[in-house]
Amino acid sequence: LEMLYFQYGRYLLISSSRTNGVPANLQGLWAPALKSPWRGNYTININLEENYWPAESTNLPELVMPVDGLVKGMAVTGRHNAQHFYGINKGWCAGHNTDAWAMSNPVGTGNESPQWSNWAMGGAWLVQTLWDHYDYTRDINYLRDTAYPLMKGACDFMLEWLIEDPHNPAQLITAPCTSPEADYITDKGYRGSSLYGGTADLAIIRELFKNTIKGAQALGIDKDYQVRLQSSLERLRPYHIGKRGNLMEWYHDWDDQDWHHRHQSHLLGLYPFHQISLAQTPDLAQAATKTLEIKGDKSTGWSTG
């Protein structure tokens, strides 16, 4: 039964990831209505990335090609997004949602919650799918022609997006930021979504910079750029452990409005990234364990699967 379930998962990805530039969306091929839930688009604050986690490890690397086409389109629209929404003239970025036309701008109808609409990290996270493809296949031509240019463009934006921490100028943080679809409560009872220096943002940037450096090294190019990325990487604000022994999600040790919310984006460093481990960072690994204990286990999908 377990093998059947495993192969069923592979089948779902195979059947819905065959068209260049059109990866598996939120509903796959079998939507029950003309207007699919969440418009049948691509949520890139976890869903699209998670769809492709099994592609390489279950020997389906060719299924990543549709993601390549989508990201290439997003890099084009994402430059406009970076310039006109964020005032940054270098690189590209994307919000938390895209579609078959590679939309990259912040989403919503003008009165949506910033907990998911005010997020600029989608592109930086999604290009890790491309890096994973290179990491598994070691296809140097793919790295040179596809993955690295898109990763570098995402880095260009993030280098401009980072600011010095006003409380510790030696460190770099993002501002503004959110932790996707989550809200906090301050010590004074204020409820909000946007702040600065969120854990998820910095985990994504940490992974992006680290892997882009590796890509440049593999290609033997951009040595000065590698130095710049490494310098910024070393200045990123580190992980912090909260008063409950949990991994802090926010810059300050604030409570979540919903401790059992399904999104646990601040655990990205644990998985799918490997910045936190029992072997290398036991204190942070224990804090991640405590976070999961607090959050509970009430589903089998993101983020509590």
Which stretches of residues belong to each language-model region?
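Acidic/His metal-coordination segments adjacent to aromatic residues that form catalytic metal sites
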Residues: 28-39, 95-118, 177-197, 253
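Extended, hydrophobic/aromatic-rich amphipathic alpha-helical segments that build helical scaffolds
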Residues: 2-16, 123-131, 148-149, 153-158
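Secondary-structure transition/capping motifs at alpha-helix termini
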Residues: 15-20, 133-145, 157-170, 279-282
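Gly/Pro-rich turn-and-neighbor structural signature
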Residues: 2-18, 23-27, 65, 220-234, ...
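Acidic/histidine-rich catalytic neighborhood
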Residues: 153-215
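Active-site core of glycosidic bond-cleaving carbohydrate-active enzymes
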Residues: 44-48, 55-80, 88-91, 101, ...
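Long, K/E/R/D-enriched contiguous segments that form extended
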Residues: 14, 20-49, 53-55
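Short, glycine/acidic-rich hinge or "gate" loops at secondary-structure transitions
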Residues: 20-29, 143-146, 163-174, 221-228
